[in-house]
Curated annotation (Swiss-Prot):
Interacts with Ran; interacts specifically with the GTP-bound form of Ran (GTP-Ran), protecting it from GTP hydrolysis and nucleotide exchange. GO terms for biological process: protein import into nucleus. HEAT repeats lie at residues 7-40, 44-78, 109-132, 138-165, 174-206, 215-251, 259-294, 303-363, 365-399, 403-443, 445-484, 487-527, 529-572, 575-617, 619-694, 697-740, 747-786, 792-858, 861-899, 907-939, 947-987, 995-1026, 1045-1073. This is Importin subunit beta-3. The keyword Nucleus applies. The gene is sal3. It comes from the Eukaryota. Belongs to the importin beta family. Importin beta-3 subfamily. It comes from Schizosaccharomyces pombe (strain 972 / ATCC 24843) (Fission yeast). GO terms for cellular component: cytoplasm; cytosol; nuclear envelope; nuclear periphery; nucleus. It is found in: Cytoplasm; Nucleus envelope; Nucleus. PANTHER family: IMPORTIN BETA.
Length: 1095
């Protein structure tokens, strides 16, 4: 075996191996140095071959195993001083062939299963490297196919283990694949059958289609492995096999279509089988749930899938109580624990909750609600606390996916949930808090607007529960409710809420204190100025926590307290905060100077806290920048923490609580520390805050932030939040430079030119639709702020990028339509599809805004470039996709608005669609078309006057629709109202019976939602009142009602509001006071207050 290998090498090599495995740190460190400097650098070929020989010759299985692991690890290390070249690639071809031969000899000889496993892993990785370099290893193929017939089951198992690691081994062996797996899946040894199942899954997932086609017919044989495992109660192997099948189902769910009903029946049988371990039952649940994500239509068509799976999920969710004899002890343990983050992810009830959430989000409310609400009304009043708990957690789980339909029945759902906030069992009350919190997020703002009293009157008393965990969860639910609540909703309850939260702040449980502080912060944020009365009582308590709560265990509490104090400062405003601001700044400065540990959570809280203080103090914060910016820049420029470990290595030092997440790659675990990514994102967001708030005062930092943080951050692909924050930072940095330099062209261009190059590159090449929208938003905001002209080459690059992205949009739309046609997806129910459509719509909106700004700056000079996109606009306008048609109409609207009469040159492309669009059944199309008619009247000149005036009958007709003022229609309705206003103002000579038309128009008011268009309507109304036009003179009660609703809505501000108020005073003064007052008396109290506040 070792023929030709220098024997004098083996002895020192064996010593090296023994040194590397020594428990003595000194011995091991010396061996590692020798490995790198003496062996890898000088004798890599002898090292790898020697390890293989020792793996063959040694009588000690532990030595053989370790040599094989070393051989694999070292082969794929990079050489010292060369970051590209791996050790295996660096050795000669002769040495490679020798190593291959030695490994195959080991394969034939090795008899210990655990060592064989290490050997297979090493062989697979060496083979992968050979194949990646277009090499071949025919001897391995021969050994593999010979070993499948070995009488030794460990040899047969090794065949499939090797194939699992490297399915490419079977490339070009199509004729032999079917017999190989037919034999393996029917092997008498369960170990071999399980190994064959894993290999089958890998081949399906990673092989070419020709190889895949050979094994697909064997899918029933794969499934046939399962029943004997269930019969034998072999839970571990059953779970392994189910996981291998799940991997196939996740990618190719439709392969199971011919046997889907059988798969459902078997999977449900496993879930029901309480004699099996939870691992097997959960694996079966995972298999069935994954079909909802990959083939929702197939699941909807099954008669049993949803009904039976929901029932089994609910039954698993009742598995929260444990054994009756242990129930009291387990409850006490649950109540007493201080570790609220303890991992329950493998508990049946948690797995089932997650399954319900996934089913709801993928199948939608129409499918998931009927079976759910068949059982929930029976579980809610159950005598068993575990069933009441399951019902509440089920409501929490399905709320997001079934949001639209559940909102319609929200009152009835609250009837089920709210009484259980007073349940005698603490875990039920905890679950009720959980449901209220989840619903407050998923059903916002309906929960806060329609049912605030019912919710708060039930939730606030739970803050006084005797159990700390229930108190904390009630406070957490209050956070969710308050985040979406108006301060008017909270005001009547603030005394009760804060009195209880301040009591919780004195709790002996630190997690209760932390939650109380967080909730106070959120309530303050929502209450805004209404929180002022509590400022003097609460701030000293928070300062005391920051100064007195010492020790590592209090770091998170202090961090949350920083958050609370600075959110309160934001809520009450600068003048109220100013007297205590220096004290808080001093406290935070001391904390910052005391941070020495890299994992101290206070550091990330400080980053945000300084940002909030900056927002409150504005330019008064500038003196503190020199202290705040250095650690902020360190965090914003930080690199991600990576590690690569082998499967055998203990992962405990890379815990999830420390922010580590791992994915398996080629037999190794690749980890990234996500907590550092979040800190980097927060730091970048704070730079946006500083630049936006301090403006010119931030200019000394602009260059450094741009070059070291923002431009590199645009391609920080590990975290989209970082890239998004960088996009938001660019316009603010430009604005800071513009203000500081008094628009000095040289200084502004110094910043703008590298930004422009980067942005044009990203909007052309970025694959993420969501990020593309951010890049376009950054582009047009930067242009708008700077007012800089684009060069012809930049205009060309912009249009070329948009051309490419529109092609991508069309492709995605076509794919969704094809999938919907085939029944693969339900675009209205599938949450992922809804999000994909929203992302595309958002992207088109941002592209439209980009062109709007470019047209506004360049006018007709941009038209030759804009014209390149006419084929897309023509296609979208004549097509049926609402999103695309709306985008094309908006593009035409901007053309009319910013090029005026010159837009007439393109009239044939859009005029028919404007006329057609104002009568569309789709509100988005009506809104875009009516806006176009309005801007044509305002900016198009005489060429458009006749067309605009002739549109009036159709416009008025659409305002008469019974649902014209419904939530989904209101913006279209208000755009039509404003379009009529513009026609009357700018095309009055073409309008027949103008006074009559204006009188009708008055009755289409008010405009209370569209803040962009409202000024046009109310400027016209003010003119009419100033002129005492007949249309207003004869409609005093109507005018008063319009004014009251307008003022109450807050839709107007600035000069338009001032002018309307002055015109209203003059107008109403023309009428007897008693007549005016009698009309006002008929208004609602809120509208009366709004009128009073504006006169």
């Amino acid at each position: 075996m070792s023929s030709g290998f220098p024997p004098e090498v083996l002895s020192p090599l064996l010593n090296l191996v023994q040194g590397l495995s020594s428990p003595d740190n000194t011995v091991r460190n010396d061996a590692e140095k020798s490995l790198s400097s003496d062996w890898i650098s000088q004798r890599a070929d002898l090292l790898l071959n020697g390890l293989a020989i020792l793996a063959y010759q040694s009588e000690d299985p532990a030595v053989r195993s370790f040599c094989l692991v070393l051989c694999r690890r070292i082969s794929f290390r990079t050489l010292p001083g060369d970051s590209e070249l791996e050790v295996f690639s660096s050795i000669s071809n002769e040495s490679k062939q020798s190593l291959q031969s030695q490994l195959l000899a080991c394969f034939v000889k090795e008899s210990v299963p655990t060592v064989r496993n290490k050997l297979c892993d090493t062989i697979a990785e060496i083979a992968r490297s050979i194949y990646d370099c277009q090499g071949e290893w025919p001897e391995l193929i021969n050994v593999i196919f010979n070993a499948v017939n070995s009488p030794d089951e460990s040899f047969r198992e090794s065949v499939f283990r090797t194939i699992t690691s490297l399915p490419r081994l079977l490339s070009g062996q199509d004729s032999a694949v079917t017999p190989l797996f037919t034999t393996g899946l029917a092997d008498p040894s369960i170990r071999v059958r399980i190994s064959a199942a894993r290999a089958y899954s890998a081949v399906i997932l990673e092989s070419k289609q020709s190889t895949r086609d050979q094994v697909i017919p064997l899918l029933p044989s794969l499934m046939n492995i399962l029943p004997p495992l269930q019969q034998d109660r072999d839970s571990d192997n059953l779970a392994d096999c189910l996981m291998a099948i799940t991997e196939i189902a996740e990618v190719f769910p439709k392969l199971f279509k011919p046997i889907f009903e059988s798969v459902i029946a078997f999977g449900l049988g496993i879930i029901k089988d309480k004699e099996l371990d939870n691992s097997a039952r959960q694996a079966a649940l995972e298999l069935l749930v994954c079909f909802s994500e990959g083939a929702p239509a197939m699941c909807r068509k099954s008669s049993d899938y949803t009904d039976q799976l929901v029932l089994q999920c609910l039954l698993l969710m009742t598995d929260v109580a444990g054994d009756p004899e242990d129930e009291a002890e387990e409850l006490q343990e649950w109540l007493n624990t201080d570790d609220l983050d303890q991992d329950e992810s493998d508990a049946n009830h948690v797995v089932a909750e997650q399954a319900m959430d996934r089913l709801s989000r993928k199948l939608g409310g129409k499918t998931i609600l009927p079976p759910s609400f068949t059982w929930l009304p029976r579980l809610i009043p159950s005598q068993k606390w575990s069933e009441r708990h399951a019902a509440l957690m089920a409501i929490s789980s399905i709320a997001e996916g079934a949001e639209k339909l559940m909102k319609k029945e929200l009152s009835r759902v609250l009837d089920m949930v709210l009484p259980l906030l007073a349940d005698p069992h603490p875990r039920v009350r905890w679950a009720a808090c959980n449901a209220v919190g989840q619903m407050s997020t998923d059903f916002a703002p309906d929960m806060q607007v329609k049912y605030p009293s019912r919710i708060l009157e039930a939730l606030v008393p739970v803050l006084e529960s005797p159990e700390s965990r229930v108190q904390a969860h009630a406070a957490a639910a209050m956070v969710n409710f308050s985040e979406e609540a108006d301060n008017k909703v909270l005001e009547p309850y603030l005394d009760d809420i804060l009195q209880r939260l301040l009591t919780l702040l004195q709790s002996p449980k630190r997690y209760v204190q932390e939650q109380a502080v967080t909730t106070i912060a959120t309530v303050a944020d929502a209450a805004a100025k209404k929180f002022e009365k509590y400022f003097d009582a609460i701030m000293p308590l928070l300062f005391n926590v920051l100064q007195q709560a010492d020790g590592k265990e209090f770091r998170t509490l202090r961090g949350k307290t920083m958050e609370c104090a600075t959110l309160i400062a934001l809520a009450v405003g600068k003048q109220r905060f100013l007297p205590v601001s220096q004290e808080l700044i001093q406290i935070l400065g001391n904390i910052q100077m005391g941070i020495t540990d890299s994992d101290d959570p206070q550091a990330s809280y400080l980053i945000s806290a300084w940002g909030r203080i900056c927002r409150v103090l504005g330019s008064d914060f500038v003196p503190f920048l020199s202290s705040v910016m250095p650690p902020l820049l360190v965090a914003a420029t930080s690199k991600p923490d990576f590690t690569i470990i082998d499967d055998e290595v203990d992962e405990s030092k890379y815990s999830e609580q420390d922010g580590w997440e791992f994915i398996p790659v080629h037999g190794q675990q690749v980890g990234i520390r996500t907590s550092t990514l979040e800190d980097k994102c927060t730091a970048t967001e704070m730079l946006v805050c500083y630049a936006a708030e301090l403006k010119a005062d931030f200019d000394p930092y602009v260059n450094e932030v741009l070059t070291s943080v923002v431009l590199p951050g645009l391609k920080f692909f590990f975290h989209d939040g970082v890239r998004s924050a960088c996009c938001k930072c660019i316009p603010q940095l430009l604005n800071a430079r513009i203000l500081a330099s008094n628009r000095d062209p040289a200084k502004v261009n110094e910043l703008w030119e590298p930004i422009l190059r980067k942005l044009l590159d990203h909007i052309q090449n970025e694959p993420s639709v969501e990020m593309l929208a951010d890049y376009f938003e950054c582009f047009y905001q930067s242009l708008e702020i700077s007012g800089l002209n684009l060069s012809p080459s930049s205009m060309e690059a912009l249009v070329a990028a948009v051309d490419l992205q529109l092609k991508g949009f069309i492709s995605r739309v076509q794919q969704r339509e094809e999938e919907a046609k085939n029944g693969d997806i339900d675009i209205e129910e599938d949450e992922d599809m809804i999000l994909a459509v929203e992302n595309d719509q958002n992207l088109l909106n941002e592209i439209n805004k980009t062109f709007s700004v470019v047209l506004k700056i360049h006018k007709t000079a941009f038209c030759p470039f804009w014209e390149r996109l006419l084929p897309y606009m023509d296609g979208f306008l004549s097509g049926n996709d609402t999103v695309a048609k709306q985008w094309a109409l908006c593009m035409m609207d901007d053309l009319i608005e910013f090029t005026g009469p010159d837009s007439w040159n393109y009239k044939d492309h859009f005029l028919p669609y404007l006329a057609e669009g104002i009568q569309s059944s789709e509100p988005e199309i009506r809104q875009a078309a009516s806006y176009g008619i309005g801007v044509a009247a305002q900016h198009g000149g005489e060429l458009y006057a006749e067309i605009c005036s002739s549109a009036l009958p159709a416009l008025f007709k659409m305002l008469e629709l019974p649902d014209a003022r419904d939530e989904e229609q209101i913006y279209a309705t208000e755009n039509i109202c404003v379009a009529i206003c513009k026609i009357c103002r700018f095309c009055s000579q073409r309008v027949q019976d103008l006074d009559k038309v204006v009188t009708y128009w008055i009755n289409t008011l008010p405009v209370t939602h569209d803040e962009d268009d409202a000024p046009y309507a109310y400027t016209f109304l003010a003119e009419l009142m100033e002129q005492n036009h007949v249309a207003v003179a004869s409609q005093m009660p109507t005018i008063i009602t319009i004014l009251a609703e307008t003022f109450a809505s807050g839709v107007l501000r600035g000069r338009t509001l001032t002018r309307l108020m002055e015109a209203s005073k003059v107008y109403l003064a023309r009428f007897p006071a008693d007549q005016v007052n009698s009309v006002i008396a008929t208004l609602s109290v809120d509208n009366q207050r709004a009128l009073s506040a504006h006169f």
